[in-house]
Amino acid sequence: MHKLLVPVDGSDNAMRALEYAIRLAKACGPTEPVILYVHEPPIVYGELAIYLPEEKLKELQRKHGEDILRPYIETAKRAGVTFTSQVLIGDIPKSIVSCAETLGCSGIVMGTRGMSAIGNLVAGSVATKVIHLTKFPVTLVK
């Protein structure tokens, strides 16, 4: 079965990317979308690092990721496709590429711009970095 990695971030473009991946999965036979949310760890300075243990911080990040994934999971369920989902914590572009490599994905389908896109004309900074870091085909959905 082919796997298509679909990184999401809560944006409309990410939802359109998932919808496109679902259409591909239905049209091309056994293809499984893998819905991925990557939570970039915050930079914590001073006393906050003392009061918020690392495990508690990771738990909060995973919970936030699950909340972000919920509408995407519901969309995939309604479409009736086989899919998986996961939350990773780390550098967003590097985590996307690493996940695609680990899972042996056939490609990456992602939105052109996400929630934090500012100023890039064609593609957001995450999409641009993923394109430069990966060996996999990347489809950008606007």
Model regions and ranges:
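Small/aliphatic-rich secondary-structure junction motif
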Residues: H2-L52
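Conserved beta-strand positions in the Rossmann-like core of class I SAM-dependent methyltransferases
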Residues: V34, T84, T139
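A short acidic, glycine-rich active-site loop
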Residues: P53-D67
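Structural beta-alpha unit
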Residues: E74-I108
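Glycine-rich, Arg-bearing micro-motifs that act as flexible, cationic patches
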Residues: M110-H132
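Short, flexible loop segments at boundaries between secondary-structure elements
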Residues: L133-K142
